[in-house]
């Protein structure tokens, strides 16, 4: 899978080339995925050999997924020029997962403009 921000940059590159339809398709792909999977309940299936790792690192994967979906929607909105919406999505991701580094990076980028 491609990193999410790579899809944003592909869209921005298409935008620079005047290929607006291709650009918007990339941005909406990010937003659509985030919207479609925001409420997913994530359960990890694992083999018994990995059980000790899961017992040590008890993460809430549904919460992480929700944060990631907000991040994706933030990226898509950056591409569409909706920076206030993007900031709101990044803030939601950070509230859900304070260590979501990329949401912090892109929130800072949006606020610096």
Language-model region placement:
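Residue-level recognition of tetratricopeptide repeat
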Residues: 3, 20, 37, 66, ...
């Amino acid at each position: 899978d491609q990193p999410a921000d790579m899809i944003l940059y592909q869209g921005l590159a298409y935008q620079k080339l005047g290929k607006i339809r291709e650009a918007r398709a990339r941005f909406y792909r990010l937003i659509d995925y985030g919207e479609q999977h925001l409420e997913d309940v994530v359960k990890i299936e694992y083999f018994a050999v990995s059980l000790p790792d899961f017992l040590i690192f008890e993460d809430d994967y549904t919460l992480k997924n929700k944060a990631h979906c907000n991040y994706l929607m933030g990226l898509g909105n950056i591409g569409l020029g909706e920076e206030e919406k993007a900031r709101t999505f990044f803030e939601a991701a950070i509230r859900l997962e304070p260590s979501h580094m990329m949401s912090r990076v892109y929130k800072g980028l949006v606020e610096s403009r």
